[in-house]
């Protein structure tokens, strides 16, 4: 469910050593399943453990997850990374904004999940997003770009070299990707 690397476990163990006896960590999602979902980690003293919590036991600590957050933390990873600029704790939760879709779900749902959980977070750095409009009977994914992607001079490269390659690799049943957007270059466009 959640991976906590050895480096992150060591970091947490040092922090927990200064807390009340028996204190562990809690991993949670605020506003799960929404575009504003945010993940967090906090201390979890023994008296804060709920009967409905799930306990994940690791070598150096336990992590508690509340019932509501659990499906949104599927495949999450917590790491403690050190580089030339210092150290930081990272929490990656690809399913926080929407639940992971079953491998047997309809193609439209699986493609939409990849767009929302993997593609749109990358496009968001430029203020952009992409929406799946339909999958045609001849297996073409019809997309519409918005935000900073609308009118961007690099949208064709993003579509063919980024999105299409990734979708065709993940979904061999797709034959291609097409852009439905009527691009209007303007102040909103990322150049």
From Swiss-Prot:
Keyword Transcription regulation set for record: no
InterPro entries: Fe/S_biogenesis_protein_NfuA (IPR017726), FeS_biogenesis (IPR000361), FSCA_dom_sf (IPR034904), HesB-like_dom_sf (IPR035903), NIF_FeS_clus_asmbl_NifU_C (IPR001075)
Gene Ontology biological process: iron-sulfur cluster assembly; protein maturation
Binding-site positions, [4Fe-4S] cluster: 149, 152
Pfam families: Fe-S_biosyn, NifU
Cofactor binding, note field: Binds 1 [4Fe-4S] cluster per subunit. The cluster is presumably bound at the interface of two monomers.
Listed Gene3D superfamilies: Fe-S cluster assembly (FSCA), HesB-like domain
Keywords for the protein's UniProt record, in alphabetical order: 4Fe-4S, Iron, Iron-sulfur, Metal-binding
GO molecular function terms noted in the UniProt entry: 4 iron, 4 sulfur cluster binding; iron ion binding
Cofactor annotation: [4Fe-4S] cluster
Protein family according to the UniProt entry: Belongs to the NfuA family.
Function: Involved in iron-sulfur cluster biogenesis. Binds a 4Fe-4S cluster, can transfer this cluster to apoproteins, and thereby intervenes in the maturation of Fe/S proteins. Could also act as a scaffold/chaperone for damaged Fe/S proteins.
Assembly: Homodimer.
PANTHER family recorded: FE_S BIOGENESIS PROTEIN NFUA (PTHR11178:SF51), IRON-SULFUR CLUSTER SCAFFOLD PROTEIN NFU-RELATED (PTHR11178)
Record's protein name: Fe/S biogenesis protein NfuA
Species for this entry: Yersinia enterocolitica serotype O:8 / biotype 1B (strain NCTC 13174 / 8081)
């Amino acid at each position: 469910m959640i991976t906590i690397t050895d480096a992150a476990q060591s970091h947490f163990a040092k922090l927990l050593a200064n807390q009340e006896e028996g204190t562990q960590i809690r991993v949670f999602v605020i506003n799960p399943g929404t575009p504003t979902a945010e993940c967090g980690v906090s201390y979890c003293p023994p008296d804060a453990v709920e009967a409905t919590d799930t306990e994940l036991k690791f070598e150096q600590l336990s992590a508690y997850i509340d019932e509501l957050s659990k499906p949104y933390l599927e495949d999450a990873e917590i790491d403690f990374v050190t580089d030339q600029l210092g150290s930081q704790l990272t929490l990656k939760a690809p399913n926080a904004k929407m639940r992971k879709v079953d491998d047997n779900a309809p193609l439209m749902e699986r493609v939409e999940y990849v767009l929302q959980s993997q593609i749109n977070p990358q496009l968001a750095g430029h203020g952009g997003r992409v929406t799946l409009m339909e999958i045609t009977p001849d297996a073409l994914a019809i997309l519409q770009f918005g935000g900073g992607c609308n009118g961007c001079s690099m949208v064709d490269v993003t579509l063919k070299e980024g999105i299409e390659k990734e979708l065709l690799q993940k979904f061999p049943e797709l034959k291609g990707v097409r852009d439905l957007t009527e691009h209007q270059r303007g102040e909103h466009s990322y150049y």
